[in-house]
């Protein structure tokens, strides 16, 4: 998923740098090209393309955030359990954790049956 986040930034930065005037270099002509001129974008077309890309990026981010919020609400619903089996499972976990603490802290070490009576 991380791969899809990089290309929009790359294209957006190239268009911004083009708008700023950083990429005004001479075009490379191959010997096979005859009189065919490559299509160039006018200032208005570049601006429209930039706006469309930003709009698409914002829509993509909104979709991703919406999916993450749906995943979070599903996780929250799974964590809140009201059924008897779920509550029993939670209580078993609490008792097993507190049992190990009680064993370590409160159990006498040298106790015989003769001492207790």
UniProtKB/Swiss-Prot annotation:
Q: Which UniProt keywords apply?
A: Disulfide bond, Receptor, Secreted, Signal
Query: Which tissue types show expression of this protein?
Result: Mainly expressed in the thyroid gland and CNS. Found in the nerve cells of the cerebrum, hippocampus, hypothalamus, pons/midbrain and thalamus. Also detected in the glia-like cells of pons/midbrain and in meninx of tactus opticus.
Q: Name one Pfam family in it.
A: Calc_CGRP_IAPP
Stated family: Belongs to the calcitonin family.
Location within or outside the cell: Secreted
Q: List the disulfide bonds.
A: 81-86
**Which GO terms fall under molecular function for this chain's record?**
calcitonin receptor binding; hormone activity
Q: Which GO terms describe its biological process?
A: adenylate cyclase-activating G protein-coupled receptor signaling pathway; regulation of cytosolic calcium ion concentration
Q: From what superkingdom does this record's organism come?
A: Eukaryota
- Indicate the residues removed as propeptide on maturation: 26-79
Q: What is this protein called?
A: Calcitonin receptor-stimulating peptide 2
A GO-annotated cellular component? extracellular space
Q: Which InterPro entries match?
A: Calcitonin-like, Calcitonin/adrenomedullin, Calcitonin_gene-rel_peptide
Q: Give the signal peptide, or none.
A: 1-25
Q: Which organism is it from?
A: Sus scrofa (Pig)
